[in-house]
């Protein structure tokens, strides 16, 4: 079905594969998987089942790929209108929408089946809910109609840690929801920094992103506020929930201080594209390193070292 006859724009079978791969927006997926993995490590207290980890990450990859493909189908008119996205598979004519829809449904079905059979039903349902929420709530309802689109729609990108936690424990407790909320609060400063960089593109296709509707100054003020909330919120995993320990706390404080500095610099210069780009790139690095710190902190050896340091310091006071 996915042969070279699908489109005259494809020179060979590998070009077809490349087009379908591009439909999934693969650069977005790794960050979603990192949050899933971090959640699983915390939930398992560092004793992760490698097979379950790989299956869960594969299921998450398929779910995210399905959601992104559906997004490409729905937003094909916007993509065609913007110079930056005009060469994507659907607006360029390399993939037909009906074929992309079949591809997305196959990916979503594989994700749900894989998680349900080899992990558990809760993780499968959560992954499916992420696809549905991303398409119906964010892409269809919010993105083109509401200035707070990315705030509410950010819930879709916050579901992966719930999937990871459910995969390990079969349930969702407060620590899982803290991880969900952490990513939910991180999403606006991350995405609004990007929106500042491509404001004109969004304005051209009448997508009401915050910089388009309210301007740069209000946008950077909102970025500043959310950043100030995210950093202390990240420490809730340490106290009072005690899901993470000293190593994570130190990492969260250091990474958070840099995040706040980036937001402050942008607040002082709201029209500086280089600062918006720096903020956007660092927001990705921040979340990646924060999740890495969660994983390292959960390792038994790190717990032993932390306990030794704590005991030593206590004996000196």
Curated annotation (Swiss-Prot):
Associated pathway: Porphyrin-containing compound metabolism; heme O biosynthesis; heme O from protoheme: step 1/1
Membrane-related topology note: Multi-pass membrane protein
Protein name: Protoheme IX farnesyltransferase
Keywords per UniProt: Cell inner membrane, Cell membrane, Heme biosynthesis, Membrane, Transferase, Transmembrane, Transmembrane helix
Enzyme Commission no: 2.5.1.141
Transmembrane segments: 28-48, 53-73, 101-121, 122-142, 150-170, 178-198, 223-243, 246-266, 282-302
Catalytic activity: heme b + (2E,6E)-farnesyl diphosphate + H2O = Fe(II)-heme o + diphosphate
Function: Converts heme B (protoheme IX) to heme O by substitution of the vinyl group on carbon 2 of heme B porphyrin ring with a hydroxyethyl farnesyl side group.
Annotated family: Belongs to the UbiA prenyltransferase family. Protoheme IX farnesyltransferase subfamily.
Further information: Carbon 2 of the heme B porphyrin ring is defined according to the Fischer nomenclature.
Tree of life domain: Bacteria
PROSITE patterns: UBIA
Location relative to the cell: Cell inner membrane
Pfam families linked: UbiA (PF01040)
UniProt keyword Glycoprotein present: no
GO cellular component, one term: plasma membrane
GO biological process per UniProt: heme O biosynthetic process
The keyword Magnesium is annotated on this UniProt entry: no
InterPro entries, per the entry: Protohaem_IX_farnesylTrfase (IPR006369), UbiA_prenyltransferase (IPR000537), UbiA_prenylTrfase_CS (IPR030470), UbiA_sf (IPR044878)
Molecular function (Gene Ontology), one example: protoheme IX farnesyltransferase activity
Main location: membrane
């Amino acid at each position: 079905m996915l042969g070279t006859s699908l489109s005259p724009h494809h020179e060979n079978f590998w070009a077809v594969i490349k087009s379908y791969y591009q439909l999934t927006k693969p650069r977005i997926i790794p960050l979603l998987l990192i949050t899933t993995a971090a959640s699983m490590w915390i939930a398992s207290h560092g004793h992760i089942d490698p097979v379950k980890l790989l299956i869960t990450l594969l299921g998450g990859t398929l779910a995210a790929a399905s959601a992104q493909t559906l997004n490409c189908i729905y937003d094909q008119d916007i993509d065609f209108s913007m110079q930056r996205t005009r060469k994507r598979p659907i607006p360029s004519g390399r993939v037909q929408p009906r074929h992309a829809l079949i591809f997305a449904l196959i990916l979503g079905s594989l994700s749900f089946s894989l998680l349900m059979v080899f992990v558990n039903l809760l993780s499968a349902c959560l992954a499916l809910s992420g696809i549905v929420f991303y398409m119906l709530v964010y892409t269809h309802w919010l993105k083109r109609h509401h200035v707070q689109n990315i705030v509410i729609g950010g819930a879709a990108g916050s579901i992966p840690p719930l999937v990871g936690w459910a995969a390990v424990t079969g349930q969702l407790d407060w620590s899982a929801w803290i991880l969900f909320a952490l990513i939910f609060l991180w999403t606006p400063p991350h995405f609004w920094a990007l929106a500042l960089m491509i404001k004109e593109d969004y304005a051209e296709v009448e997508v009401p992103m915050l910089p388009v509707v309210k301007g740069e100054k209000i946008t950077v003020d909102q970025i500043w506020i959310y950043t100030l909330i995210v950093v202390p919120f990240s420490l809730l995993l340490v106290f009072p929930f005690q899901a993470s320990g000293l190593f994570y706390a130190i990492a969260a404080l250091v990474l958070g201080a840099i995040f706040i500095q980036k937001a402050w610099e942008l607040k002082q210069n709201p029209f500086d594209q280089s600062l918006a780009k720096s903020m956007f790139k660092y927001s990705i690095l921040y979340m990646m390193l924060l999740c890495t710190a969660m994983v390292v902190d959960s390792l038994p050896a790190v717990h032993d070292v932390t306990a030794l340091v704590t005991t030593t310091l206590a004996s000196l006071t």
